[in-house]
Amino acid sequence: MAPGAFSLHQATSSDQEITYIINYGEGQTEPLRTKILNTYTMVFNDGSAPGAVDTSWLGTLGLTGWVGPEARGAVSGAGITGRDPRFAYTVGFSNATAQYWAAADTTDGHFTSAGMIPGTYTMKVYKNELAVDTRTVTVNAGASTSAGTIAVTGDPGAATALWRIGDWDGSPAEFINGGKVTTMHPSDVRMASWTPGDYVVGTSTPATGFPAYQWKDVNGALTVRFNLRQSQIVPLRLRVGITTAFAGGRPKAQVNGWVSANPSPSTQPSSRTLTVGTYRGNNTMYTFDIPATELVVGQNVLTLTAISGSSGIRFLSPGYSYDALDLIPTP
């Protein structure tokens, strides 16, 4: 349960209630899928892991929309190449009426997604929580579709960077407070300071030097200092990845005297996210092309400023969650 959802905590002196919420609406990135019949089982026992529960009797009730096992299909992949061994990979399937997930094997990336309703799906390979490959696949009743071996070509982390802060994986976990944001409110006294001071490339570390979240009214300007050699004074591209944003928050970049244009806001959930325990939204990468004439040999100063046409106070001001940022030669 997300922090702040106190209205969901209900109890009296004589009874306790369990509320199982399937569709909550916080951080919702896709239209609500309706008319989906799924089986959910709540088991009360001594605390040990329950065994398989037979729910096949649901198929005898004549429920509208029920699709039995024999009318479903599967997708299997022989493997996934181009993976980063530091991360787990997941394969997701989605269309307007259904959604499925399958874990990729840690050794070679093979996977199987069974019990799928027939149809055409968008299939995405996720590096942790960042989509790094997208394609379509068709599922047929009573059959298994082969996706072959998938070669990942869309991982931004595969690019050689002059420097990189964080990991391109769709999560802020490696940054300051990144491991706490799903269980604590940003104002919690157990949180480290959201304003850590300048980040110095080559000296600072993401875990202690760069915040997971940035808000317009909390830590509205973050500074990164980095050195360049003469051979590195070429057109460079700054890439800034965010995982979600609130109230149109997005980063604007300044490098030395060069100031970027205001980027457009990303498409994100309309609800609160950063203050209700989720960093998950629509992963978005902002790119800023820096002219070589604006760079200097020695120390350069990058300032990231949280901007938005909206306003708010403190943690309810426009903001966003970081995925990673890096500097690469302009392609």
Predicted regions and their residues:
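Beta-strand-rich recognition/accessory modules
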Residues: 1-68
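A short, solvent-exposed beta-strand micro-motif common in secreted/extracellular proteins
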Residues: 109, 119-129, 306
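Structured interaction patches on ligand/partner-binding surfaces of diverse proteins
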Residues: 129-148, 152-155
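Beta-strand-rich ligand-recognition modules
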Residues: 219, 227-233, 241-330
